Amino acid sequence: PLFVALGKDIRGVVVSQVVPSPRSAATPIVREYLAAIDNSDQSPSYESLEGFIAAKALGEAVRRNGAGLNRASMQKALAGLGDLDVGGFRLHLRAGVRDSTWAIDLVTVTADGRVLR
């Protein structure tokens, strides 16, 4: 990770995040995520929250696809999700579009690796 590579020199680095803070239960998706990792060895992180959100979208595409799942039908199902609300976090999934979210949060990293919003 960037923190390991830079050590204390990371102080003041600004990083863009494309998901909500994994430590703020202000949105339903973060509350669901925190409940899912509760009582596990998983610590809340931006990376695992992003994976959780992606898994929710993938699950919805599988549900909508129905029987006969294959690569082509899955691509079509994902592209067909359109504007998808995943627990208060909006995704915009369309054919040929690879940037599925317009949410960007800028955070600053402290010398000890904490993230400040």
Q: Where are these predicted regions, by residue range?
A:
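Extracytosolic ligand-binding ectodomains
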Residues: 1-117
